[in-house]
A protein has these predicted regions:
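Extreme N-terminal starter segment of soluble prokaryotic enzymes
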Residues: 1-5
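Loop-to-helix element that buttresses phosphate recognition and phosphoryl-transfer chemistry
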Residues: 10-64, 149-154
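Phosphate-coordination/substrate-recognition cap region in phosphate-metabolizing enzymes
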Residues: 38-127
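Acidic, low-complexity terminal tails and accessory targeting/binding regions
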Residues: 68, 85-107, 146-147, 151, ...
Length: 240
């Protein structure tokens, strides 16, 4: 059997002008992953990332750690199948529509007025609103032309996963640097969970964590979820 490792990118820049950029902590998280793998002699046969900067940068940091240690690291491939869903687009296009009809969402948004998005309270309020909007998105209740549907997103991710399964069928270890949504879509494929459960699992995927699957032509099995043995201190654990 082969092994597939899905790595969530290091912490991005939530609340900043450009989210798609690793924070200083995200850079540190990525470095410790690379260091942990090098120390344990982790051999990778193939490495991929999505097209987003935070995904590619996480891969680059791990690659740099390997090369600085004189360890082999394969040339990476970029595959848009592993891009995250467009959370900004979903909120931009669906939130105004839902605010007209969802009183719970209206109340949450009203509470957010004047609160710093990066404060603990601001993050909590954002997450509550985000979950309501995302529930509508995955249910397909409110579709807009500008936003990729949940069904299309899942199909896109699984196309990428199935290509890896076909291209690296036996005795290989493949790493993919991606995001929480793509990891949750792959989890759903492995454990056959309902859509809402799959999306909920995405909320708890830690930055810089590793989720592991073992596969062959007949099986695709989850063998490790959200693993962060490379984080020596709780201060390194983030979810957004």
């Amino acid at each position: 059997m082969s092994t597939l490792l899905l790595i969530r990118h290091g912490q991005a820049s939530f609340g900043a002008g450009d989210y798609d950029k690793l924070s200083e902590l995200g850079i540190t998280q990525s470095f410790f992953l690379g260091e942990y793998w090098v120390e344990r002699g982790m051999k990778l046969d193939a490495v991929f990332s999505g097209e987003q900067v935070r995904q590619k940068h996480t891969l680059e940091i791990v690659s740099d750690v390997y090369r600085a240690a004189g360890s082999d690291f394969p040339e990476s491939g970029i595959n848009g199948a592993f891009n995250e869903y467009d959370a900004t687009g979903i909120m931009t296009h669906l939130l105004p529509k839902l605010l007209k009809e969802n009183s719970e969402l209206q109340e949450i948004v009203n509470k957010s007025s004047g609160i710093d998005t990066n404060s603990p309270e601001g993050r909590k309020i954002f997450q509550l609103a985000f979950e309501i909007v995302m529930d509508h998105w995955i249910a397909g209740k409110t579709e807009v032309e500008e936003v990729e549907t949940w069904a299309h997103f899942k199909a896109r991710v699984l196309d990428g996963i199935k290509k890896i399964v076909a291209d690296f069928p036996s005795g290989k270890t493949v790493a993919v640097f991606t995001s929480g949504g793509a990891i949750s879509a792959t989890l759903q494929y492995a454990i056959q969970s309902p859509d809402k459960v799959a999306l909920g699992l995405g909320w708890v995927v830690k930055n810089g964590s590793v989720t592991e699957f073992r596969y062959n032509a007949d099986r695709f099995t989850l063998t490790g979820f959200n693993m962060t043995p490379h984080f020596y201190d709780d201060v390194l654990v983030t979810y957004r």
